[in-house]
Amino acid sequence: MRENTPPRTPMDELIGDEEDDGLIYVGDADEVLDAWEQEGNIDEENDDDDENLFNALRTGRRVVKDDAKLTFDMHKGAVFCGALHPTEDLAVTGGEDDKAFVWNIRTGEVQFAVTNHTDSVIAVGFSYDGVFVATGDIAGYIQVFKVAQNYRKVWEFTAGDMCWMRWHIGSHVLLAGSDSGEVYVWRIPSGDCKVLPGHDAKAEAAELTQDGKKLAVGYGSGHFKLWDLKTNTPIIEVDPSIGHAVNITSLAGDQENQMFITGAEDGSSCIMGSNGLMGMLSAPNSEPIEAVLMDYPGFEIKVAATGTLHGKLTIWDVARQTKRVECSDEEPTGITKLLWLKDFTICAGTLGGIIKGWDFRSGLMRFALDGHSDDIQDIIYDKERNIILSTSEDWTAKIFEVPASQ
């Protein structure tokens, strides 16, 4: 691993540049010693308690109940990313240990291991039809393997320090954003490439439109661009003097490919449209926005959601640009990612390791899934199987079944 460099994590915005002189604080010293003493009295066969105590001492949180259907624990470091195969019982995960694994979501058995990355694997994914699986590390080394041919490598490339990587939603095209601001677009497996030029700022976040023809990109400078992937030109461009003045951390689009919501690390969130900036949902404040969503399919009005690193989840009326609901949470924990689920449910991965779900119409919490002992880095939803794949700083990935709506 090159200098053991992880990607930007949500906690970066909260802790800044403070150092702790190498000390790891896991709570009151007496409590830790008591835990060690208690562990010494536990029968050696109680493996589950051993693992829970190890996680508690390492991360400061002991899991009381694990709601997961399956836990994958082959990684030897934080697990940063994951993806689910569109039809097969397969997941792929990547982590700080410079490795990626393809594994069976029913048994946990490893199907394929990618061990030749030299830095943290921060992006993985299956192509839209499951034919290919891609892995990419923070240094920009990307590999693509053909699933049905015993994971034969069909393509590789080094693009320079990478921020994100994702597959196109309807073709064998792979996209990646770089620290230098360029966005690479490759045909797989031929490797034919075109580049969407940058401008001295990270291509921090990106989202394809529903028709797959355009790519919205948020940059570290606060710039927002909507690129036409066929002509290689920006259709919309909003510069920092009008929109965000700082790093855009997340963005999402609507079903009609006409509007986007953006969130930034200064707490601001904007609505972008065909003519540029349409309005600001939230002005800069002390709560960095880490995740956004827009336009729940089939709902009566167009809504958007913003999740902050302080744990606030807000549902917005897009047309009126007003707050509709603030979701209730008696123990708020920083939100790292948001997903729409079935039955008018919005789901959040959190810094506390809990996966939470709310009815976004009322803001009432529907479920809280426990199992992770440290921050959740990624969550992925499979609508057909109604399951969630989660990845965490606790070195594990887990499969959860979504609880039935009450």
Give the ranges of each region predicted by the language model.
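Acidic, serine/threonine-rich intrinsically disordered low-complexity regions
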Residues: 1-66
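Short C-terminal beta-strands that terminate individual repeats in beta-propeller domains
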Residues: 69-74, 81, 94, 110-117, ...
